């Protein structure tokens, strides 16, 4: 009973837009998107996990595979990435983790429908 007053950590709840299913994403890209939604800051829509951290969480062994899924999400306009720099104690600059920004689902849908219209125009 000594610990009964301690509160349990609240689970992180988030929703995944239903529209994700029509965008033609691979299962791995959906998993990476899901993870990024899980770790993002809910106010800024940003997060900084490394490829290694994402891979470990999703049991993907290769950093290259994680990078492929991240590129797929960028190509579908679901996320935006930008490089970061870390300054070490000795003043040297090193590459940091990517900064991921989750884009509004509407951006991805507009991109998807635009591509569909272009494909249909080529067929006609």
Where are these regions (language model features)?
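Short recognition helix of helix-turn-helix/winged-helix DNA-binding domains
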Residues: 1-56, 63-64, 71, 93, ...
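Winged-helix/helix-turn-helix nucleic-acid-interaction surface
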Residues: 63-124
